[in-house]
């Protein structure tokens, strides 16, 4: 399944994309009319949090089938053209990110490949698909992109052994880890350079892990104004998904809705000769196999 959060008519909701339809099933409305018992999560995060007691996907499937059988299916669907995409997990939880997890990317920035380089991104930096974000020219002329696979955590745990780590994964999404390279080079910590307003575009969907059975063998392609900048594969990750979860959970308790950004392949603007940073009016597209394309616009 592909889940998303969105705004429609000034109301925040969440839903599911079914098959090849260019519309979202509004699960807030579907559950209001067709939920089994008291299962009626008001947000996608609430659905993930209740997944340990009731199979969230199965409850969604049953409710959508009931809506289809009602003869009023169209009343519960909204065209993608009419919605504003929000970060898939809304309200947002923790975003924990790994840097230098692709050797070629570390090399292009002249960084040593370290065993563990972790930072967080502020919740206020999150935005959804098709968002227009500030160009931040008032503070930097080195705005950069990083296309990444995001892991969506599905259940709580800490000190999770590698052998069990994938049991804690609910699904995957796309992240563009927008970075102020100027601040990154001047500061000892990464939080500020990674937490600009609009600096964490995410989405458009969460794809459940059953629909992405080989997440460590998917292509990541980033285009700026239709020019391919990054063309990598998650198979190039230094720490694999189970290792990332094991490492983080040694120190941080993970909870449903937490997002782990797994690092970016080579091809960022700062690594080019000469560097090619994002400019006002640019369009950035990050595509990952079987998830979709995350589009971001830099304001003029």
Curated annotation (Swiss-Prot):
PANTHER family: ACYLPYRUVASE (PTHR11820), ACYLPYRUVASE FAHD1, MITOCHONDRIAL (PTHR11820:SF7). Keywords: Metal-binding. Coiled coil: none annotated. A divalent metal cation binds at residues 146, 148, 177. It comes from the Bacteria. SUPFAM superfamilies: FAH. This is Uncharacterized protein SAR0930. Transmembrane segments: none annotated. One of its GO terms (molecular function) is acetylpyruvate hydrolase activity. Belongs to the FAH family.
């Amino acid at each position: 399944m592909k889940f998303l959060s969105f705004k429609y008519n000034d109301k925040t909701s969440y839903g599911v994309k079914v098959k090849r339809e260019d519309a979202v099933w509004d699960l807030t409305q579907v559950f209001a009319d067709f939920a089994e018992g008291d299962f009626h999560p008001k947000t996608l995060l609430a659905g993930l949090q209740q997944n340990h007691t009731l199979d969230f996907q199965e409850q969604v499937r049953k409710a959508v089938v009931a809506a289809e059988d009602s003869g009023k299916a169209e009343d519960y669907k909204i065209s993608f053209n009419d919605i504003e995409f929000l970060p898939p997990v809304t309200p947002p939880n923790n975003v924990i990110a790994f840097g230098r997890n692709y050797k070629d990317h570390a090399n292009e920035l002249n960084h040593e490949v370290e065993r563990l380089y972790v930072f967080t991104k502020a919740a206020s930096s999150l935005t959804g698909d098709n968002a227009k974000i500030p160009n931040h020219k008032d503070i930097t002329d080195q705005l950069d992109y990083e296309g990444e696979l995001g892991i969506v955590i599905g259940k709580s745990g800490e000190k999770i052994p590698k052998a069990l780590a994938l049991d804690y994964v609910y699904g995957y999404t796309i992240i563009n880890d927008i970075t102020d390279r100027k601040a990154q080079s001047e500061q000892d910590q990464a939080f500020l350079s990674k937490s600009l307003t609009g600096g964490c575009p995410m989405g458009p969907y969460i794809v459940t892990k059953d629909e992405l059975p080989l997440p460590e063998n998917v292509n990541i392609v980033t285009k700026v104004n239709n020019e391919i900048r990054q063309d990598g594969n998650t198979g190039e990750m230094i720490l694999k998904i189970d290792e990332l979860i094991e490492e983080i959970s040694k120190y941080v308790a993970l909870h449903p809705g937490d997002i782990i950004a797994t690092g970016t392949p080579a091809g960022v603007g700062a690594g080019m000769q000469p560097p090619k940073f994002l400019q006002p009016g640019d369009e950035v597209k990050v595509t990952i196999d079987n998830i979709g394309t995350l589009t971001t616009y830099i304001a003029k």
